[in-house]
Amino acid sequence: LNAQDRSQARRDFGFTDETELIVGISRLVPRKGFDTAIRAVAKLKSTRPNLVLAIAGSGRDRERLEKLARELDAPVTFLGRVAHDDLPKLYGCADIYTMLCRNRWAGLEQEGFGIVFVEAAACGIPQIAGSSGGAAEAVSHGETGFVVEQSDDVEQVARYMETLLNDPELRQRMGVASRERAVNEFSYEMLAERLGNVFGVWS
């Protein structure tokens, strides 16, 4: 989004240009790790009065997450379901995208390929991810964002959030790298070409 469209998108979702906006978009289940994100922004709120974690989506974990946010007085906004056509605006007006996905049931429940990270990347937004399953493949640590080794490590998550929020140039570089990687490695055309090569379709 250009600056004008970004400002308008923020107003549409109830935020301002001054908001330090971290966005998470997902089905709300324990594996997605939004409880860790809530704890992290709660730690940062005293020094970052404009910080907001905006969580879009619905699911069985929403009630627990809302209760946690209230208990911690965390700067969290629950947006509920966001229309598919509005998702690019929500991604595009964020400073950071996060989903701290974790393994559960001794690794039997893991994150699949992190398509939401690719969607955020395509919008030029750096990401903070958990290390479960394909999420760590979707985010290139130190290049397009950060991957947290232990998804419950609130201190590390808060440090990565601060690193990005404190450094607009780093966010810009990671955003550009994210966009390039999304186009060059994860576009439908590139994936179709790779599958074609694997199965000999184009030979």
Task: Briefly describe each language-model feature range.
Residues 16-32, 38-42:
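Conserved donor-binding/catalytic core segment of Leloir-type glycosyltransferases
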Residues 22, 37-41, 53, 157, ...:
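A structural motif in glycosyltransferase catalytic domains
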